[in-house]
């Protein structure tokens, strides 16, 4: 299972959003196309998880909590 700390680490290492400790679970995350690619790449490299969110899924990608909720709802085969 991917933790919220895993998500924070991926975003912190691949973007200029700042250190992971500055990302509370409910903090706003600006998910532009670059940040989404960083997240997709990090999840695939570290956890073997491939995501391809649809437009309506992006509503969840506004916080660590939302991203984590999206990931935990994915079918197991991903």
Curated annotation (Swiss-Prot):
**GO BP: any one term:** antibiotic biosynthetic process
Highest taxon listed in the record's lineage: Bacteria
Q: Does the keyword Phosphoprotein apply?
A: yes
Q: Upper lineage ranks?
A: Bacteria, Bacillati, Actinomycetota, Actinomycetes, Kitasatosporales
Q: Which family does it belong to?
A: Belongs to the acyl carrier protein (ACP) family.
**Cytoplasm recorded as keyword:** no
Q: Which SUPFAM superfamilies match?
A: ACP-like (SSF47336)
Which protein is depicted? 4-methyl-3-hydroxyanthranilic acid carrier protein
Q: In which pathway does it act?
A: Antibiotic biosynthesis
Q: How is it modified after translation?
A: 4'-phosphopantetheine is transferred from CoA to a specific serine of the apo-form of this carrier protein.
Modified sites of kind O-(pantetheine 4'-phosphoryl)serine: 33
Q: InterPro entries of this UniProt entry?
A: ACP-like_sf (IPR036736)
């Amino acid at each position: 299972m991917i933790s919220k700390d895993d998500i924070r680490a991926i975003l912190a290492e691949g973007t200029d959003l700042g250190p992971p400790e500055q990302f509370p679970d409910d903090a706003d995350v600006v998910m532009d196309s670059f940040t989404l690619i960083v997240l997709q790449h990090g999840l695939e490299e570290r956890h073997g998880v491939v995501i391809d969110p649809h437009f309506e899924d992006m509503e969840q990608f506004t916080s660590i909590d939302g991203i984590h909720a999206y990931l935990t709802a994915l079918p197991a085969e991903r």
